Amino acid sequence: MSLQWLQQTRHELSWTWILLTTCIALISPLVLKGIYNVYFHPLRNIPGPKLAALTDFYAFYWNWIRDEGYSKQFSRLHEQYNSPIIRIGPNNVHTTQVEFYDVIFKSGSKWLKDKSFYKYFNGLDAMIEPYQYRTYRTHLAPLYAQRAIDGLAPKLRSDLTNSASGMMRQTKNGQTVNMAKVLRTLSTSMILHNLFSLDISLNDGDEYHPFLEAFEQLMTQSWLFVTYPMVPMVLSLIPGTSFARFNSSYTTFSNYCTAWNDEDMRKQRESEEQSTRDSHTKRYLSLKDDDARKKTAIPYPLDDVFNFVAGGSDTTAYTTACAFYHILSSPTVRENLVVELDEHSSIIRDEFDYNKIQNLPYLNAVIKETLRISVPVPGSLPRIVPQGGITIGSFSLPAGTGVSITQQAISFNEKIFPLPHSFLPERWIGPKSVGLDKWNIAFSRGPRQCIGTTLAYLELRCVIAYFFSRFDMALTGNCGDQLRWVDRFVAVNLDDVELQILADRWT
C-alpha cells in the first residue's frame, strides 16, 4: 500500500465527504420542515392528505403537472375525510361551511389576502396592504362606475355588429363558428378600450388576432408562472420546447402591450387634456408629481395589463361561452329566453338601450345561473385568520392560517341550490328566489369585490341578448354531453364551444 494511493484515497474521500455534507445541509431543513408540518404544526389534526400537509408542491402537482386543478379535488376530499374542513396545504385549510363566507368577506373584514399565495401576482387583486388597494381602486373606480359602463354600449354594439358579420361569412363558407374565439375577441376589445385611450381593433378580419393567440398560450402555463416564475423563464431558453413557444408568446403579448402603451402615452402628452377619452393610461398621467405616496401605490399601467386582460376578458368570455352552451343544450331555456328577447326586440335591434336590456328578468336569470354553474374563478383564494384565531366546528385555527371557501363550495351546495348540477334559470325568479342573490358571488363580495363587475354584466347581458335575438343557432356537438374545464387560476374550457348559424332572423 503506497503513500501515493493513501493520499489519492484521502483526497477522493474528502470530496465525497464535502458533497455528502453539502447534500445533507441542503436537504435537512426541508426534511425537518416536512416533519414539523405533518406532526407538530398547529394544523396537524385537521383532516386531509398527508402530502398536502407536507408541502405546497401537492397543489402544484394537481394544478400544473396533472393540469386538472387542485380546487376540483376539494369536494372529493371533503367526502373522503367526512369533514367540513380539510387541510389543503401546510398552512391552508378549505371549508364548506357557508356561514364563514359572510365572516371572511363582510364589509370591514380584517381577513387580509394571503401574502404567500399572491407573492408572484401583480396588480389590483393581489394587493395586500389596505391603503395601497384603496388608493389604486379609487384611482380606477370612475372607469368602472355604472355611468361610465353605460357609455360603453355603443362601442360594444359596433363590436357585436362586426362579429356577427364575420360569423355570417363563416356560415356562408360552410364553416362552424368558434364562439370561444368570438367572445374572447369581444371581451378583450372591451377591456383594452378601458386600459388605453386608443381605438384598438382585434376584429378587422376573420383571422384570430395574434395578441389573443399569445394570451391563450400564456394562460396554459399560468400556475407554473405564478408558482415558480423563474422556471419557465430559464426553460424557455431551450429551443424547440413548449417553453420556447411560451417565451415567444410572452414576447408577442409584451410587444403589443408596449407598443399600445407607448403610442397612447405619446399621443396624450402631445394632446390637449380633454382631447383623449378616459383610460388607465390617462389617469396615470394625471397623477400629481407632488403626491409621492399615491404614485407609489399606483402601478404603471403597462405593469397591470396582463392582470386586467386575464381578469377582465378571459373570465367574461369563458362565462359567456358557458351560457351559449347551456342555453343551446336546453330547448326550454332557449325558448323562454328567445320569447322574452322577441318581446323586447326593439330595445336590442333598434335602440340597443342597455338601461332597458339590463332589466329583462329571464335574461338576468340565465346570467345568474351561468355565473353559478360555470364558476369563473373556481380555486382557492385564501384569506388570513386575524389576531385571536377562530374556531370552525371542532377545530381551532390560529392567527396566520390561510382559510378558503371556494365558489364551488357554495354554488354546488344542495341546501342553497337544489339540483346544483342542473342549469335552472327559473330558480332566480319568483318567490323561491328570495334571498338567493346573497349567494350570487361570482364577483366576490365586500370591499374587495371585482372592480370590473359592471363591465362584465354589460357584456354578458348585451352579448347574449344580441346574438340570441338575431340568430337561430345550434351546437355542433363537439363539446359532448358536458363542458370539460380546468382551473388555471381562472376557469378555462378544454373544448371550444362551436355552433352553426341556422338563420339570421334580422334579415
Curated annotation (Swiss-Prot):
The keyword Membrane applies. Signal peptide: none annotated. It is a single-pass membrane protein. It comes from the Eukaryota. InterPro entries: Cyt_P450 (IPR001128), Cyt_P450_CS (IPR017972), Cyt_P450_E_grp-I (IPR002401), Cyt_P450_sf (IPR036396), Cytochrome_P450_monoxygenase (IPR050121). Its cofactor is heme. Glycans are attached at residue 247. Keywords: Glycoprotein, Heme, Iron, Membrane, Metal-binding, Monooxygenase, Oxidoreductase, Transmembrane, Transmembrane helix. Its EC number is 1.-.-.-. The chain crosses the membrane at residues 15-35. Its main location: membrane. It is an enzyme of class 1 (oxidoreductase). GO terms for biological process: indole alkaloid biosynthetic process. It is found in: Membrane. One of its GO terms (molecular function) is heme binding. Pathway: Alkaloid biosynthesis; ergot alkaloid biosynthesis. GO terms for cellular component: membrane. Heme binds at residue 450. The keyword Iron applies. Disruption phenotype: Causes a blockage in the conversion of clavines to D-lysergic acid. Abolishes the production of the peptide alkaloids ergotamine and ergocryptine but accumulates substantial amounts agroclavine accompanied by varying amounts of elymoclavine and chanoclavine which ranged between 10 and 20 percent of the amount of agroclavine formed. Also leads to traces of chanoclavine aldehyde. Belongs to the cytochrome P450 family. Cytochrome P450 monooxygenase; part of the gene cluster that mediates the biosynthesis of fungal ergot alkaloid. DmaW catalyzes the first step of ergot alkaloid biosynthesis by condensing dimethylallyl diphosphate (DMAP) and tryptophan to form 4-dimethylallyl-L-tryptophan. The second step is catalyzed by the methyltransferase easF that methylates 4-dimethylallyl-L-tryptophan in the presence of S-adenosyl-L-methionine, resulting in the formation of 4-dimethylallyl-L-abrine. PANTHER family: CYTOCHROME P450 (PTHR24305), CYTOCHROME P450 MONOOXYGENASE ASQL-RELATED (PTHR24305:SF210). This is Cytochrome P450 monooxygenase cloA. It comes from Claviceps purpurea (strain 20.1).
